Each structure stands twice: as structure tokens, then as C-alpha cells.
Amino acid sequence: MITVFFPGCGPTYPAKTMPQQLTRMVKDELQTDIHIRITGKTMWIFVPLTDLIDEKTAGWDKAGLEKINKIMNAAHRVILSTDAKLDFLAVVGADVKKFGVALLAVEYLPDLGEAVLEKFSRGEYFMRSVRDVRFDPTLIGDLTGETQSYRDISFDEFICMQIIHRAKNLFIKDKKLSNLFELKTTSYTQKFGVLKLEFEFLRKRYDLSPEEETIKPLDYVKQIAAEVIQNYNYKDIQGVELTDTFSEETIKLSLDELKKIKVELPEYRD
């Protein structure tokens, strides 16, 4: 849910007191303790949870997910009426009880403002909101987030994260692709203006039709990379290098090539 909030003349949440105000708001409204750290232009919110994972099924607990959603909505309300100079919001919802699972959500804050003004669809907003899951046993018993590291997220890093996020969604939600491939692992680095992303695509089947034989995962990832670069009209990179570590195929694209690609991806998101 995207919360719409119209700020008045002055900031309701001044930069100096905004973290304390948001912490108190979440405590009062949701009876939940959060811990905020601002690193550069990135605001991190650590949310210790005992109800993020259902112990019987080892799946997500709806109560915990709903709590994270409400905390993010509260953060949106505050961010839309603060004079703090922020580019990114990063929320870590952590199971501190048993499993040590963390759900990470990263948002580029100008996207939030454009979503409020309906400059793109709700579905596009959620595709721009990066989600990731990781396992970290040091989270168990960590009620303040002291075991975690907090960095100032760069826009190059966010671009890499969003390409990976969109690729994961595509290869899970598109029936044809999910039947053929599993995206097992991903990684990224940035060097000399080139974004280097690695994807490990495992084949699920080898009894392929002639049409299926021609399908290459990186052909889709290439379009995703172009879509992200075009969406932001991003100009501060030399290009991208995409590698499928399973097939050992690599595609290198300059910024000019990325901007000229006609994006024709499956429309499962609409």
C-alpha cells in the first residue's frame, strides 16, 4: 500500500528529530520497537520480529509481513514530510527468535514521490521496490540490529539490485520460464563504470521442444537491464556485463546499446 500524505509549509518531521519521531510513532501505533540508522543518504530501519516465520510450516507468517508493511507505510508518511536529505529507505525485517531469516526491502525515495503523483502504475512501483531474503544466524537474539552492517547505498548498487529483483520475479512468475529454469544464485559488482551481474540459471528440464531449445535466460535479463536503465534515464555508467555462470554465456552492453533495446517482456505484472 502506498500512503498518500500532503505536507504543509514546513517539515512536520525535521531531519534532526525525524528518526526519534518515527521510532515513537511505530511504538505508539504498532507496539513495535524499531531501530533506525542513517548512513549517508540511506535510512536503515531494523525491525526485530518473533512472528515473521510460522514455526509449523517454516513459511512466512502473515502477521509479521503485515507488521513490516505497516512500518513501511509509517516511514513513507514521515519521509514525505521531512527535510532530511535521503535517497534510499532500507528496511530489514528480521526473525530474531529461531530461524535467523531477514527480509530486506530497499526503495529509491524519488520513486515514492512519483508513485504518490501516479506517474507510474502501482505494479511498476512494487517492481522498483527491491525485495531480498537472506539467512543470518547472528540475527537470532539480536533485538537492536547490532550484528548487522549498514552502508550508504549507491544508485549503481540499487540499479544492480533492481535488475536482480525483476529477474527473480520474472523467472518465478512467468509459467514458461519457471518451467524451464531456476534462478539459483545471483551476485553483482561495479567496476570502472561497468555493472557486472552474475546469474546461475539451472535447467529444470532437458526434454525440450525445438522452440524451448532457443530460449536463453540472458536474453530476458538483457531486456530487464535495458528496462531499468531506460526507466531512470540513467547516464552515469559505461554499460553492463551479464553472465550466466551455469552456461558460461556473457553479454556485454554499452549504455547506448541499452538505451536502444526495445523491451518486450512478458506482461505477468499487469
Residue ranges of predicted features:
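Polar/charged, Gly/Pro-rich intrinsically disordered segments
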Residues: 39, 44-46, 50-55, 81-270
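Mid-chain, structured segments of secreted extracytoplasmic proteins
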Residues: 56-92
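Extracytoplasmic/secreted envelope proteins and their assembly/folding machinery
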Residues: 19, 23, 65-76, 218, ...
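Post-signal peptide N-terminal segment of mature Sec-exported envelope proteins
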Residues: 18-38
